[in-house]
């Protein structure tokens, strides 16, 4: 290869908001850090039928409009998507089937891109970076003799689980059993044995367990795995993979990658209302409650949270989703007279500018669903967390934060709303009090890990991991030429 700056990287994200926003930030990080070694990053964006595409694409384009070296290419939709009923019943099965249907579209897009690069002769595609849900697309990389790297928008602990699943499956060829909830699993990278009850709910049903295993079995085929975490946060997990005896890909701890922009469908007037209210509150006086973008709270659970907030009597911002078929707005789901009683105490909203809220000096605690992006954002701003996981790998994240790292306060570790599980008002109120008191999880400890994250990115371990990844990528292009 004649010039170092002639390398192009192709990134293929998964279109859930947390995944695609982290991907955009990853691309910016690679461009800002590598100087001229990467000429261009091309993001091949594809959508899902139930995600409004026009608004999403416009928002994503706005995020990269000042980044001339980042190109966003939108791909056509799958013509015969899996039935929506499959997503409702077995989300992981739907996701894997949809990704497989995207493979021919990705192949055509990549073929077109490679042909244009061959004609110009000035830029060479160095490799692919795939969201971990997109690992079936490793086959496309192999067809074009391109190395595939995985971008894991989760923790090193989650990576340990993905290594563990195929190993367990070779011995026990069936899904996990909820009746063995207290069974302990020796997951790589964990100091503590991990109880079955905190594993992703999809591992307990055959229809969704098999896609998890199929994805995990493809991980060793990658050239390397970029993990959105850092060594100071998960030292044991990364130490394990550093000395991993198996033929496993190189691990690059490149986090924290923080999503600096909130989701596209936030009303700007609502954002202004929330931030203006926060500006008037004392430092560290507000608890922020937010439960993610995919789960609706039941009416019973909403009532219990409302009672708890009245009991605890501290300032709050409470963001939650409701079923639009049942309620036109979150206010309709609240107990009668609740807003009148807490008029001076807090704000209720359906959507909130999470990054801005967590960054605000008035916020002193976060009751979180424990999505990994949310955990990194909260830690990044030094805000203590109380764990209330809802779905996917969030129970495992909560276990990691509470039991493994001692960086969060336990509300619940194994909450499963589908089982009719309800957290009572007294329990919620007690946890919120403890969170805001800062005794069980001192704010100083969270601040220390926040500083460690900043240092990792600013010339420290994560900076060096990105540098090593770029070097490996460019060297691979030079060798293959």
Curated annotation (Swiss-Prot):
| EC number annotated for this UniProt entry | 2.4.1.91, 2.4.1.237
Gene, per the UniProt record: UGT71C1
Q: Which domain of life is it from?
A: Eukaryota
Q: Which residues catalyse the reaction?
A: 19 (proton acceptor), 131 (charge relay)
A GO molecular function assigned to this protein is:
UDP-glucosyltransferase activity
Q: Does the keyword Aminoacyl-tRNA synthetase apply?
A: no
Catalysed reaction equations from the record: a flavonol + UDP-alpha-D-glucose = a flavonol 3-O-beta-D-glucoside + UDP + H(+); a 7-O-hydroxy-flavonol + UDP-alpha-D-glucose = a flavonol 7-O-beta-D-glucoside + UDP + H(+)
Protein name per Swiss-Prot or TrEMBL: Flavonol 3-O-glucosyltransferase UGT71C1
Top EC class for this record: transferase
């Amino acid at each position: 290869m004649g010039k170092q700056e002639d390398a192009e990287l192709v990134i293929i994200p998964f279109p859930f908001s947390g995944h695609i926003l982290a991907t955009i930030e990853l691309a910016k990080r690679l461009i800002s850090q590598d100087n001229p070694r990467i000429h261009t990053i091309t993001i091949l964006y594809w959508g899902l039928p139930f995600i409004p595409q026009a608004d999403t694409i416009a928002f994503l384009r706005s995020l990269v409009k000042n980044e001339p070296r980042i190109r966003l290419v939108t791909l056509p939709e799958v013509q015969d998507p899996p039935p929506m009923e499959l997503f409702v019943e077995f989300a992981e099965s739907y996701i894997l089937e949809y990704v497989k249907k995207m493979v021919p579209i990705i192949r055509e897009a990549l073929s077109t891109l490679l042909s244009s690069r061959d004609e110009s002769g000035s830029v060479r595609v160095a490799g692919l970076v795939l969201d971990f849900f997109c690992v079936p697309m490793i086959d496309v990389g192999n067809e074009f003799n391109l190395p595939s790297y995985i971008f894991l928008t989760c923790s090193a602990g989650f990576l340990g689980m993905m290594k563990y699943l195929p190993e367990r499956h070779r011995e026990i060829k069936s899904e996990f059993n909820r009746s063995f909830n207290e069974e302990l699993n020796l997951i790589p990278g964990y100091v503590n044995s991990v109880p079955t009850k905190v594993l992703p709910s999809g591992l307990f049903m055959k229809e969704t367990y098999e896609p998890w295993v199929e994805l995990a079995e493809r991980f060793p085929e990658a050239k390397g795995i970029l993990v959105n975490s850092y060594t100071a946060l998960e030292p044991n997990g990364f130490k394990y993979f550093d000395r991993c005896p198996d033929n496993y890909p190189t691990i690059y701890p490149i986090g924290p990658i923080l999503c600096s922009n909130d989701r596209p469908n936030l009303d700007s007037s609502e954002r202004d209302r929330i931030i203006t209210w926060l500006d008037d509150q004392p430092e560290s006086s507000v608890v922020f409650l937010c439960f993610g973008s995919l789960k609706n709270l039941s009416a019973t659970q909403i009532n219990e949270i409302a009672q708890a907030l009245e009991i605890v009597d501290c300032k709050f911002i409470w963001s939650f989703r409701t079923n639009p078929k049942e309620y036109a707005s979150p206010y309709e789901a609240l107990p009668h007279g609740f807003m009148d009683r807490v008029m001076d105490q807090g704000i209720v909203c359906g959507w909130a500018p999470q990054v801005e809220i967590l960054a605000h000096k008035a916020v002193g605690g976060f009751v979180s669903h424990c999505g990994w992006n949310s955990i990194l954002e909260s830690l990044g701003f030094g805000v203590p967390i109380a764990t209330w996981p809802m779905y996917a790998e969030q129970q495992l994240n909560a276990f990691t934060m509470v039991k493994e790292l001692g960086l969060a306060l336990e509300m619940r570790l194994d909450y499963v709303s589908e089982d009719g599980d309800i957290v009572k008002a007294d329990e919620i109120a007690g946890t919120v009090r403890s969170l805001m008191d800062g005794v069980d999880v001192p704010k100083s400890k969270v601040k220390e890990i926040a500083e460690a994250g900043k240092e990792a990115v600013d010339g420290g371990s994560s900076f060096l991991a990105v540098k090593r990844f770029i070097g490996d990528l460019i060297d691979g292009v030079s060798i293959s030429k």
